[in-house]
Amino acid sequence: MAMANLARRKGYAVVLSSRSSLCLTRWRGFASGSDENDVVVIGGGPGGYVAAIKAAQLGLKTTCIEKRGTLGGTCLNVGCIPSKALLHSSHMYHEAKHAFANHGVKFSSVEVALPAMMGQKDKAVSNLTQGIDGLFQKNKVTYVKGYGKLVSPSEISVDTTEGENTVVKGKHIIIATGSDVKSLPGVTIDEKKIVSSTGALALSEIPKKLVVIGAGYIGLEMGSVWGRIGSEVTVVEFASEIVPTMDADIRKQFQRSLEKQGMKFKLKTKVVGVDTSGDGVKLTVEPSAGGEQTIIEADVVLVSAGRTPFTSGLNLDKIGVETDKLGRILVNERFSTNVSGVYAIGDVIPGPMLAHKAEEDGVACVEYLTGKVGHVDYDKVPGVVYTNPEVASVGKTEEQVKETGVEYRVGKFPFLANSRAKAIDNAEGLVKIIAEKETDKILGVHIMAPNAGELIHEAAIALQYDASSEDIARVCHAHPTMSEAVKEAAMATYDKPHSHLKSWLLLSSLVFIFVQEFTMTWR
């Protein structure tokens, strides 16, 4: 960080990432008064619209091209935002039905009004897309609705939504076209019986039986939505575990929590056949390694096998932009492709396919173009599974740290010993911190809690500034708060929990967890 600060004072741009430790470049000026754009962004998702707005704010003549007709990309229109709206609505229903009585709130009946639930989701999406439109107008970003394809490193042919064709020119072109649903061989998505995440956000009725193919973030979130409001959910996963990138300790408790909620898992299982000829769907499955086949029946099947970069029709090969075998555009630490003047950010390049990562890419790319300071460190991008409880992480898992050979220490603290969690009767989960043994530098933090997605950012800041577990432990945290569990886990990492009382609570909680695990194993 000291070197980066020195570079800033000298007038250099700085890009920090896992791909390169430090990159410097002098400020570059731009001509004004020309009809040609300084920056043209293809794609109006989180990476694209943020890059466009940032470029305009820095004084660049900017145009953004978006084929969907509404800004926000997959995230805002058919991803992050609508799914979180449904997750919250379904959680409220589940709480009303199963938890309110414990708090003295009773009523005779509760039911799901699915049209109203969908209406709330659509309202949230509409308000936010209109908000981005307003930001474009405020910052004087030219918005072209249509499908853009490269005809040269400085020209984009656009088939507009009005049926016309126009050519947009730019000194610098940023490709931010995002990603699309990854298909499965032999499983055809019709968005009726067999749906993608897009279709799962718009079902007209609650399926009695829902099968989710894929136990990743999206599949588990959408399975949770429909499971909470009445669907019998079965998750089919080819791998031996859910969310393979998750820390093993957290994963174990997370799966147990989902199973307690009624979600069923068929791990090490692959789909080998699909029959949609009847009223529902019949899936033929077998062990991933081969073996006896069985049939799973469902009303709706959700295909959630990941996402793939969306680059088809961009004419990348025509202008010579290099991609890897997965279709991702290859860029350097400055987001430059091998073609001068052409850049790429977000899901179309290597790195986690996350909206917030794309936003950071967009800002850093534009800041580089104007000689300002930009940075993205892919090793410190937080990730969240927005189920209940939520699971959030930043940095390395314990398994990844082991692979490096670095000696480390682990501190854990369960929410069963957290005063606020007990007060609100929602004490499931824990905080786990991994720190280097010699320096106490935090290497990874993993949280399972009702609000893990909010709590994780204390850890994200700590990792960004190379903090130690003692640094977190010595910060005064308000009492009673869920965030105290982060402090206690930090104390457990470098020393011990704060007080004898909390040590006793911790011991009691660990005994309780052990009994739970033993009982479930015995059953």
UniProtKB/Swiss-Prot annotation:
Localization annotation: Mitochondrion
Cofactor: FAD
Keyword Zinc: no
Note describing how the cofactor binds: Binds 1 FAD per subunit.
Name of the featured protein: Leghemoglobin reductase
A Pfam family this chain is assigned to: Pyr_redox_dim
MF annotations from Gene Ontology: dihydrolipoyl dehydrogenase (NADH) activity; flavin adenine dinucleotide binding; leghemoglobin reductase [NAD(P)H] activity
UniProt xrefs under InterPro entries: Class-I_Pyr_Nuc-Dis_Oxidored, FAD/NAD-bd_sf, FAD/NAD-binding_dom, FAD/NAD-linked_Rdtase_dimer_sf, Lipoamide_DH, Pyr_nuc-diS_OxRdtase, Pyr_nucl-diS_OxRdtase_dimer, Pyr_OxRdtase_I_AS
Residues annotated to bind NAD(+): 214-221, 237, 271, 306
Disulfide partners: 75-80
Domain of life from the UniProt record: Eukaryota
FT transit peptide: 1-30
Subunit structure: Homodimer.
Keywords for this protein: Disulfide bond, FAD, Flavoprotein, Mitochondrion, NAD, Oxidoreductase, Redox-active center, Transit peptide
Transmembrane segments: none
Catalytic activity: 2 Fe(III)-[leghemoglobin] + NADH = 2 Fe(II)-[leghemoglobin] + NAD(+) + H(+); 2 Fe(III)-[leghemoglobin] + NADPH = 2 Fe(II)-[leghemoglobin] + NADP(+) + H(+)
Organism in which the protein naturally occurs: Glycine max (Soybean)
